Amino acid sequence: MRTSQYLLSTLKETPNDAEVISHQLMLRAGMIRKLASGLYTWLPTGLRVLHKVEAIVREEMNKAGAIEVSMPVVQPAELWQESGRWEQYGPELCRLTDRHNRPFVLGPTHEEVVTALVRYEVNSYKQLPLNLYQIQTKFRDEVRPRFGVMRGREFTMKDAYSFHMNKESLIETYGKMHQAYCNIFSRMGLDFRPVLADTGSIGGTGSHEFHVLANSGEDLIAFSTESDYAANVEMAEALAPAGERPAPTESATKIATPNAHTIAEVSAYLKVAEQQTLKTLLVKGEEDEQGKAGVIALVLRGDHELNEIKAEKIAGVAAPLTFASEEEIRAVAGCDAGSIGPQNLQCRVIVDRSAAHLADFVCGANENDFHMTGMNWDRDVQGYEVADIRNVVEGDPSPCGKGTLLLKRGIEVGHIFQLGTKYSEAMNATVLNEAGKATVMEMGCYGIGVTRVVAAAIEQNFDDRGIIWTDSIAPFQVVIIPMNMHKSERVQELAERFYNELQAAGVEVLLDDRKERPGVMFADMELIGIPHSIVIGDRSIDNGVVEYKYRRSGDKTEVAIDEIIAKIKAQLNK
């Protein structure tokens, strides 16, 4: 490809609405252009990268035994009503009607469609296991699209769905897909981690997320220092402190704490460490048969954060987690939120493991502007339950029993689930087993955010000059930069020679044949992030050499004219 025949579309300035580095660089490198909120046009450079990612995904899915299909983006509402997700899904599900006033959705995912397909096409255990996938456009009406293609409304996704006679078969395919995902992200040259994860709105049992590690990541990942254990903070278990709880040494005392409502204010006023204080949060419980929802108290150490996912999984706690209103708080505790304590509450009390290990702690007095000191479990507070309801923190013991936890930020680019029979049972997707009896199929689903992978790769691979692509997903492998080629016949001839030889060797090469200053050409190619550069000039030709530059390291070397093609091939074959 020649730049004179190409839509390069680079920008010198960063658009004001681009927050994260991947969004900034994708706009500046001429990869994407915004059409509307959360909607982007992919320009030639971006599309080349997107196609590279898709090709790797497709190859590894095929190797893993999955079969490619293509399903409609527009889906009939009746399928979502059949699965029960028509009511469960929020406003991010884009609902529409056709000219006959029939309801449809723009598909954010395809569990319903693929289940409807398989229940008609598969009727015998002999046809299982079956793993179908597609690489296709999805639409989720995000309330606040941001970060460019990282969280857009329209995006490209690889979604696969497997069907099985039993759980054992599902687990086997799940393992194959886990390995396929590791292969995919390794081939892209990404630093990633598979982590234990929550199943979220998709449902099911076992689940892993795949995260590209990056400081800009929205998710926090917990890793063991001495094992392969890794989990999303939402799922990482916070173990109970070792040893026995200390014995009480103080008497319970009520102390005035005027204008001290937060943990920081209370600990500063009483001159105690935050980890010696408790905070009590009141949340709504599930509705009873009369439609009434009670209140449940969740108690944590003052320096710890509530894990809402863990809290939602406690029997009786309403999901999604909803905090009690001011009126409900006063009815249960007799005070405002900043003064609640776990003692004498007329509701169920659930205490985090670390909080339950404290002695002589500080907590609210259930009276405005007062707190209790010297409080102790069982002596001063009775009738409580103990559970893991907090986020882990760095330095906590690893749940695997080896080492302690480190925390890093990650960008979720893939998610795999063992769905079980959630959709197949709801939609009556059965096959006949060996005895001729109808059996509900077990299902798995496996997603990769293809467009998000492109952005995540940039978040992990950039410098102050632009993107640094790995060879496997770069828009071009090599760029030829001939200085003053329109004034030097021999520079032009050598550039054309290299261009033709590299093309003949199957190398994806870009020849920058614009009438531009060398500084502009260098800046554009570093911004785009092409891994390998060949710089040709009259002076270097006089010395029988050209300059080779490796984008990632910035190293420059002079290479003999007759050896540069062999060097490029060797670099690409590493």
UniProtKB/Swiss-Prot annotation:
Keywords: Aminoacyl-tRNA synthetase, ATP-binding, Cytoplasm, Ligase, Nucleotide-binding, Protein biosynthesis
Subcellular location field: Cytoplasm
GO terms under biological process: prolyl-tRNA aminoacylation
GO molecular function: aminoacyl-tRNA deacylase activity; ATP binding; proline-tRNA ligase activity
Enzyme class: ligase
Coiled-coil regions listed in the entry: none
Leader sequence residues: none
One Pfam family matching this protein: tRNA-synt_2b
Catalytic activity of the protein: tRNA(Pro) + L-proline + ATP = L-prolyl-tRNA(Pro) + AMP + diphosphate
One annotated Gene Ontology cellular component of this protein: cytosol
EC number(s) on file: 6.1.1.15
HAMAP family attached to this UniProt entry: Pro_tRNA_synth_type1
Homology family: Belongs to the class-II aminoacyl-tRNA synthetase family. ProS type 1 subfamily.
Subunit composition and interactions: Homodimer.
Domain remark from Swiss-Prot or TrEMBL: Consists of three domains: the N-terminal catalytic domain, the editing domain and the C-terminal anticodon-binding domain.
Role of this protein: Catalyzes the attachment of proline to tRNA(Pro) in a two-step reaction: proline is first activated by ATP to form Pro-AMP and then transferred to the acceptor end of tRNA(Pro). As ProRS can inadvertently accommodate and process non-cognate amino acids such as alanine and cysteine, to avoid such errors it has two additional distinct editing activities against alanine. One activity is designated as 'pretransfer' editing and involves the tRNA(Pro)-independent hydrolysis of activated Ala-AMP.
Full protein name: Proline--tRNA ligase
Organism: Tolumonas auensis (strain DSM 9187 / NBRC 110442 / TA 4)
